[in-house]
């Protein structure tokens, strides 16, 4: 471990003393650079960008491929991608700031902050005539249960009842533009783990308590203090030329997706800001968030969270509740996804925790998560290392994307161990 830390620090010196061009960043971790380049040269991915850093900042970044389907614009390290559910970590941090200020309590039912949820129901299934079987919920989820995805809210991509409910009009689809937040629970709060729209409700609570729109709260309390200049809900027109086309893998070919493409929007123009997704960012910007967590909540003199709060994020917050792979019911949106990669895992506050680490990679109780368009991150407090990998492909948990992520991770830790 000491050798690993020494190498990381020496890598930082190499990066810090050189110029900031792509060649310097690639030289810092040549094995990682090779992983990204190979994924592109072999045609597995159309675009890839990645970064690795530690407590001192970004040590390495690299991009390859093209940011457009026509392959006219070469990829760059500062390309802006849709990070989708990587938004959830930002929302969790924002909510934990309110906990520290004493205006939000982790173990209080969310009805204290959103009274209209006082009559929640649980969708038990459907009868023979396809009528929904809805039962009154025993209680509302707590704020902690929203952060840990034990609140009972799910996604229609991985839950058959939720998918059927949206098809029959019992609830709105996430893609409909309607009131998808009104969906019933899939199970009683605190009884199971399933990934879902829990963090979307957390965003609503932040807005209710702060009196600000979520985008404004993030700008003032997270993006501004961390000097994140390329993270936003509305993509500015002047930054469109750094955005990346979303592709779909169909019959082993990558084609341009007809929807969900990046589009410019005026700042403050969105009707709804989701705590569960919707942000654009770069690997450099998002790395600032992970670097802050490695520094126990502080970065460049700005304190975003107290050390004790950061500690709580990386502790098991779900007890004996077991995580399970997300079995797909919408294969065009997501493959079956095992975010533990076959290793023991639990859940902290806003983070999946690898309770025993990954052999040859991230250490025990490292945190991680991902975004729908196949962007992934990990933050390893033991090794003081973070990693980010991103492409823009559907469906989620794309085999080539996950393979590249894991090879990247192995390359980073292999080099640090030598």
Can you name each region flagged by the protein language model?
Residues 120-359:
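Short, surface-exposed loop or secondary-structure junction motifs
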Residues 25-83, 103, 122-128, 398:
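Short, conserved catalytic-motif segment at the N-terminal edge
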Residues 389-390:
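C-terminal soluble interaction/assembly domains
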Residues 366, 373-386:
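Short, surface-exposed beta-strand/loop micro-motifs that present aromatic residues
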Residues 36, 56, 82-110, 199-207, ...:
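Active-site SXXK
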Residues 15-16:
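C-terminal motif of bacterial Sec signal peptides marking the signal peptidase cleavage site
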Residues 4-12:
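Sec-dependent N-terminal signal peptides
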Residues 53-54, 109-121, 310-312:
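Acidic helix-start/capping segments at beta-turn-to-alpha-helix junctions
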């Amino acid at each position: 471990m000491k050798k690993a830390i020494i190498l990381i620090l020496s890598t930082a010196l190499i990066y810090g003393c050189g110029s900031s061009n792509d060649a310097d960043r690639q030289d810092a971790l040549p094995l990682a650079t090779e992983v990204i380049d190979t994924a592109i040269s072999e045609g597995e991915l159309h675009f890839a960008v990645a970064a690795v850093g530690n407590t001192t900042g970004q040590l390495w970044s690299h991009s390859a491929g093209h940011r457009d389907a026509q392959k006219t614009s070469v990829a760059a390290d500062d390309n802006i991608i849709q990070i989708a559910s990587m938004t959830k970590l930002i929302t969790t941090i924002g909510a934990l700031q309110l906990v520290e200020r004493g205006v939000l309590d982790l173990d209080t039912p969310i009805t204290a902050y959103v009274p209209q949820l006082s009559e929640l129901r649980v969708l038990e299934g459907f009868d023979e005539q396809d009528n929904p079987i809805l039962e009154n919920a025993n209680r509302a989820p707590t704020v902690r249960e929203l952060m840990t995805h034990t609140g009972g809210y799910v996604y229609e991509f991985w839950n058959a009842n939720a998918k059927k409910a949206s098809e029959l009009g019992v609830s709105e689809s996430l893609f409909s533009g309607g009131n998808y937040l009104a969906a019933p629970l899939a199970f009683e709060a605190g009884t199971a783990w399933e990934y879902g729209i829990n963090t979307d409700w957390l965003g609503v609570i932040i807005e209710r308590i702060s009196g600000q729109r979520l985008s404004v709260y993030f700008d003032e309390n997270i993006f501004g203090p961390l000097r994140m200049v390329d993270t936003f809900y509305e993509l500015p027109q002047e930054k469109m030329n750094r955005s990346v086309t979303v592709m779909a893998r169909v019959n082993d070919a990558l084609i341009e997706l007809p929807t969900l493409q990046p589009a410019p929007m005026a700042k403050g123009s969105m009707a709804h800001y989701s705590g569960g997704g919707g942000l654009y960012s770069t690997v450099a910007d998002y790395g600032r968030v992970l670097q802050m967590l490695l520094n126990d909540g502080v970065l460049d003199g700005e304190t975003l969270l107290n050390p004790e709060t950061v500690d709580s994020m990386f502790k098991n917050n779900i007890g004996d509740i077991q995580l399970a792979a997300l079995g797909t019911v919408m294969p065009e949106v997501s493959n079956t996804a095992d975010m533990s990669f076959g290793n023991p895992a639990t859940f902290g506050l806003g983070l999946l925790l690898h309770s025993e680490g990954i052999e040859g990679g991230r250490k025990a109780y490292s945190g991680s998560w991902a975004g729908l368009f196949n962007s992934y991150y990990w933050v390893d407090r033991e090794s003081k290392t973070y990693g980010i990998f991103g492409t823009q492909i559907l469906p989620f948990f794309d085999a080539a994307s996950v393979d590249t992520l894991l090879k990247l991770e192995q390359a980073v830790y292999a080099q640090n161990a030598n």
